[in-house]
Every structure is written in C-alpha cells, then in structure tokens.
Amino acid sequence: ELIGVTVGGKGVAAPLASKAALGRGLDRVVIVEDVSLADAGRSELAAVLAEVIRHIGDVDLVVTGDSSVDVAAKMVPTVLAGELGWPAVAEVTSITGQAGALRVERAIPRGVQLLEISGPAVLAASADAAAPRVPGMKDLLAAGKKPVELLELAALKVPPRNAVMTVTGRAVPQRKPRKGQLIDTADPAKAAAELVSALRQAGAL
C-alpha cells in the first residue's frame, strides 16, 4: 500500500492537491493541517511526521523529497529518521526491492554509492530520481474515490521541542534596475562593436 503524508499550515489539505497526488498512484493520503505549522521549524515538522507514521503503523519505508521548495534546508528527512530511530539515506537516485532488503543507489561527488538496507528506513530521493507521472482522466476519476484521512494535530500528542525556531520575518532581495539598450543588427560588424563598447561601459569587460 502506498500512502501519501503531508503536514502544514492552512491550505495543505486542498482537495485538488490530494486528488492530484492520489491520481499519481497513491492508495490513500493522510493530512495534518494546522495554522501553527505554517512557520514550523524543521524539527517540529519532522516530529509531526513521525507521529503520523506511528499513527499509520506497520510502515516499511518512508520516501521523501530531498528538500522543500521554500526553505530547502534538507533537514527534515534525517531529523525524521532520528525521531523514528531508523537509518536515513540522502541523494537517492534508485531503489530496487530484493529478497528481504532494498538495494539503494545514491549520488556522491565522484560517482554512485550502492547500499543494501534491511528493515525500515527513510530515503530522501534526489530531484532527478524519477520523472513525474502525469495522471490521465481515468486516474483522476479514480482518485476521487480514494480515502483522505484528516488528522488533528492535538490528537497526535507530539512531544514538545526543547528548542523551537520561529520565523521572525521575510524579505525579498532588492533588484537593481536593468538598463535596456537596443542594437541594430543590420550590420553585424557594427553591431558587434556597439555590443563590446556597451559591455565595457557597463564594466562587464
């Protein structure tokens, strides 16, 4: 059975998101939506995910992305594994099942590392580990009939964290105004000379 799990702030339980995930092959999804999780730290999110996994029970393998698109800290998979007491493997590019174990390939700076894992584990897949599956109309219609379980954060009784990270603000880097300059390319040699001159004036050459 393939179970999708997501936790987060308001909007994480959007029906369209659940349907899209179920249409890609999941059997069911389990969701924890709570406003307090909108700015939760990595350790807090990992603790909630661990409690959800314990709630599901009898989980053989947890597969995550390597990082989130917003913070990209790459911390949740390893912290989650620590919460569960399971081994963690990052930058996974391939997973193959074999008798009583998993054969895992992971990218390393000078090549590929091959690992054999027995027992439950947390594997963080690299961004190019698999091509996203595009669900068809039949998949989306079937997804509407699959179960979606909504869990209350309070019911999970997540142990309090000794240290808590709080987001105190966000800022968008200021962009320098760009100087646009059009160059007539009717005469290639003249255009090239104008381009070189413009780049020198801008300090790019």
What are the language-model segments listed below?
Residues 1-205:
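N-terminal glycine-rich FAD/FM-binding segment characteristic of electron-transfer flavoproteins
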